[in-house]
Amino acid sequence: MSLTAHVYQIYIAATPEQVWSAITESEWTRRYFHTVAFVEPPQQGKPYLTVGVDGRPAVDGIIEEMLPPEEGRPGRFVQTWHTRYDPELAHEPASRVEWTVENAGRGLTRVRLVHGNLEQSPLTWENVKDGWVWILNSMKTLLETGQPLPRVSEDEILSPADRS
């Protein structure tokens, strides 16, 4: 059996609305997501493009679902994910990223991220597995302390076992 998705879950000491903003608004993403930001505000059913501070395309796709969290209902942000920041990855088919943002009580928000549809994208599979851990923890740190984790290179994100 081959694995086709990465699944992550974290708890953040912030409101679901704050977490939602951090996921969907460029003034937030640029601070914790490797300086990447949406070119235009994301809209359900519309294409999107993210770029780095240098203006180079990072990721593009379609926003499939954009349902902000409300009292008693989790938020969902679902996007297709076509990597553009690496020419080798750009040749692979688009995958799918699903964010779920839910009030967990006690001032906490549960964030679940599933990066799936990776069965035809082995390079993307490998590339994003450690990257999402860093991004999620940097978002958590930013929301809880006001400062993201320090910027690092992809090699610095890899676990020691993956560097060999």
Region locations from a protein language model:
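Terminal, regulation- and interaction-focused segments at domain boundaries
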Residues: M1-P16
